[in-house]
Amino acid sequence: MKTKVWLLAVLASFLPNGLFAHPTGGEDRAYWVETLVKIADPVLVNLSEGTLKKNMPFESLSDDPLRKDVSYREAVGRTICGIAPWLELGPEDTKEGKIRSKYIKLAVQGLRNAVNPQSPDYLVFDNRHSQPLVDAAFLAQGLLRAPRQLWGNLDSETQSRIITELKRTRTIKPKESNWLLFASMVEAALLEFTNEYDTQRLYYGVNRFLDNWYKGDAWY
């Protein structure tokens, strides 16, 4: 057995280094960017063109007629939240930087459509059901993560419309669970961008987690 192991080791030493090479940091990053584009591109391209509701596939086991409407907000909120830190790096004169520049522009135009009542992709964050609070929180977190490249690149009318949609969710009472933090996240964005917030909705969820539910080391 030892002889076999020794022989394999000797043979391996003559093989090209690339055969057992691990991906470099640059290769890893390129893969992650490629994956990001695959996920975000269908959402942002269609949203920017006003065709998200027209082209986005929809499947659901729920009989709730509002479920389809929810799916569009989920796609937009989670996409914006997920890619915002990357977008905030800003455009650069590199391959990745040019890709990033493209998606900053798509996201900004997409957000304009998402809150424009005249757009076919207008997303209403009303209280017909409770899910809009969750979707608004993801969108709010994305805007907080990219204050320069997203919020800072929006025109004042779009900013005002986003504020209006976020405030609509104040009529939704969060469940006594992690949903409390969804309300807190919305208010944190309103505080950041307008300097106005609902004290109860901002602090109640945060204090509930800190004082009653958080046990330490990510345990609740």
Language model region names:
Residues 49-53, 92, 175, 219:
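Intrinsically disordered or highly flexible coil/loop and linker segments, enriched in small
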Residues 72, 83-86, 100-220:
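Aromatic-lined, polymer-binding surfaces characteristic
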Residues 47, 87-91, 195:
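Helix-turn/linker elements and helix-coil junctions of extended alpha-helical scaffolds
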Residues 1-7:
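Bacterial N-terminal signal peptides that target proteins for export
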Residues 8-18:
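Bacterial N-terminal signal peptides
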Residues 95-96:
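Long, charge-dense tracts
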Residues 61-66, 92, 120-125:
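Glycine- and acidic
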Residues 22-74, 81, 85, 105-112:
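Low-complexity, Ser/Thr/Pro/Gly-enriched N-terminal "stalk/linker" regions
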